[in-house]
Amino acid sequence: MKVSLPAFEKAKVLVVGDVMLDRYWVGPTGRISPEAPVPVVKINQVEDRPGGAANVALNIATLGGQVQLAGLVGEDDTAKALTLGVQALGVEPQWLKIADKPTITKLRVLSRNQQLIRLDFEESFDKQDSARLLKQSEALLDSVDVVVLSDYAKGAIDKPQDFIALARAKGVKVLVDPKGSDFSRYHGASLITPNMSEFEAVVGAVTSEADLLEKARGLLNKHQFDAILVTRSEKGMTLVTANAPELHIPTVAREVYDVTGAGDTVISALATSLAAGAELPQACAIANTAAGVVVGKLGTSTVSRIELIEALALHHGESGFGVVSEDQLAYALEQAKLRGERVVMTNGCFDILHAGHVSYLKQAKALGDRLIVAVNDDASVKRLKGEGRPVNQVDRRMAVLAGLAAVDWVVPFSEDTPQRIIARLLPDLLVKGGDYKIEDIAGGAEVIAAGGQVQVLGFEDGISTTAIIQNIMAKQ
């Protein structure tokens, strides 16, 4: 997906929540234990990674953001290992140390890239510990633009309503990765990011898309949230806000190896993007892409800016793009505009695709973020070009166009001109190749009336479908 990244280095974020150490024991399995019907793992690798709220902070730091981290830890060696882990990426933690509690540890045993078992070492922190942590964190609010509350229901985030209210009063956005069935604890938050299971634990089973939207808007009104982003695994994400249409973002993950930390990645990318000045739809698209990267890795992982740029480029051609119907395109276009993308549209027969076409389409795409190509169907090509045309049927012409890197959507139309479909879609920019006058371009008046632009691009001299056909026939 083509989404421009904001200046992450300008982002100032505070992460408060349940920190933990993710510990991995890794090795091969070659036999079954004689003591019980379980595999024997010969450990040859041990690795510690910051997890929970600490993983959120590391994700923000890896993207280039400035981050402060506050959490509860014990006075133990695990806390020391966790401190070293976050300091390695330049994060200086603000721990509140609790003498009689252990630092939370999740130990995973893996073999052949598969998790065999997880062992948890933890005790929930007391309510007064959470109150002290949140009070300590209030002093950091004046130095940040966004706060993330990373709640794993381990006791760090007990009753954060006063903290949320204070942050909002200071103009600081508050993002919450929620836990449990009581979202009233996060009353007044800017955005919450439940996964589908967490969402249904609060609102009940979701029976349809309309039901999801209705229940999400009910939560918005009840708890005074600005927005809810429901993460939906293979169905992507759905953003619901009070005063705008919903935004559905399809998943971008190609292979899923491990979902550990995917929720952390979503909220960290959201927080970094918003703190850097991105609008919410753009931030959601960035977060969705980041999540698609991290689930392709093993264990708790972070996503770098370079990985994110590469993933955004690779996302072209994913679900929702390519050859589409007019209705599908109308919906996709609505979603693109909600993400703040500039949409360019052109049209033509494209009977035999040649170098001139490719050059022209690259020029058109360079003028925006998305390119629509409307293609004359076979009957309209025959009316325009005469007997013997088209050489290639419309489905083949569209398939070739959809394979070009410059093209996002290809849609057929049956009229002699694309005026009707252009008037329906109303792109930000309508382009046409050749020596047309702007006032003569079909659909141009409608685009201009809607606040868009019309532009004429030049074709490469000496290259045309007609000339290619004549050259082929001359050689027969």
Swiss-Prot record:
UniProt keyword list: ATP-binding, Carbohydrate metabolism, Kinase, Multifunctional enzyme, Nucleotide-binding, Nucleotidyltransferase, Transferase
Catalytic activity: D-glycero-beta-D-manno-heptose 7-phosphate + ATP = D-glycero-beta-D-manno-heptose 1,7-bisphosphate + ADP + H(+); D-glycero-beta-D-manno-heptose 1-phosphate + ATP + H(+) = ADP-D-glycero-beta-D-manno-heptose + diphosphate
Pathway in which the depicted protein is active: Nucleotide-sugar biosynthesis; ADP-L-glycero-beta-D-manno-heptose biosynthesis; ADP-L-glycero-beta-D-manno-heptose from D-glycero-beta-D-manno-heptose 7-phosphate: step 1/4; Nucleotide-sugar biosynthesis; ADP-L-glycero-beta-D-manno-heptose biosynthesis; ADP-L-glycero-beta-D-manno-heptose from D-glycero-beta-D-manno-heptose 7-phosphate: step 3/4
BP GO annotations: ADP-L-glycero-beta-D-manno-heptose biosynthetic process
Highest taxon of source: Bacteria
Binding-site residues for ATP, renumbered to this chain: 195-198
Pfam family membership, one: PfkB
Record-annotated active site: 264
Enzyme Commission identifier(s): 2.7.1.167, 2.7.7.70
Annotated function: Catalyzes the ADP transfer from ATP to D-glycero-beta-D-manno-heptose 1-phosphate, yielding ADP-D-glycero-beta-D-manno-heptose.
Family: In the N-terminal section; belongs to the carbohydrate kinase PfkB family. In the C-terminal section; belongs to the cytidylyltransferase family.
Classification via NCBIfam families: cyt_tran_rel, PRK11316.1, rfaE_dom_I, rfaE_dom_II
Name of protein: Bifunctional protein HldE
Species: Shewanella sp. (strain MR-4)
